[in-house]
Amino acid sequence: MKLAILFPGIGYHTDKPLLYYSKKILKNMDYEIKEIHFENLDFDLNKSKDEAYKQAKDQIHKFDLKAYDSILFISKSIGTYCAAKLAHEYKLTANIYFTPLDFTLEYLQQKDL
């Protein structure tokens, strides 16, 4: 089984083109899709990055990641920070980042796009 988890930006949700079309393509490739949802984040990215990460981690814990043979994170903006940090933590290597932030870079891995 294959899983794709989408991490939105603060104002760029999964119904916007980059994530919407990514989701459609992945569904056609037989990925199960899960979406992270952020609530009440400050538009100042430096202020909101830790809260966004906490919210993403809380939601990821509800997914049975061990049930999947392949896991892909697709993320945008503040979501790139959360996805990169969680991928580092869970030792996952499949990531696609749209508009990564400066503080995302410390968690990027060689195989990331």
Regions found by a protein language model. Give the residues of each.
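Aromatic pocket-lining residues of Rossmann-like dinucleotide-binding sites
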Residues: 26, 86-90
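Conserved alpha/beta-hydrolase fold motif
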Residues: 68-73, 95
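A conserved short beta-strand
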Residues: 90-103
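Short hydrophobic segments within beta-strands
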Residues: 5-10, 74, 98, 113
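The feature captures the conserved acid-bearing segment of alpha/beta-hydrolase catalytic domains
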Residues: 100-113
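Serine-hydrolase catalytic machinery in alpha/beta-hydrolase-like enzymes
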Residues: 2-68
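Gly/Ala-rich beta-loop-alpha elbow adjacent to hydrolase catalytic centers
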Residues: 71-83, 87
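Short glycine-/acidic-enriched loop or helix-start segments at secondary-structure transitions
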Residues: 15-17, 82-85, 106-107
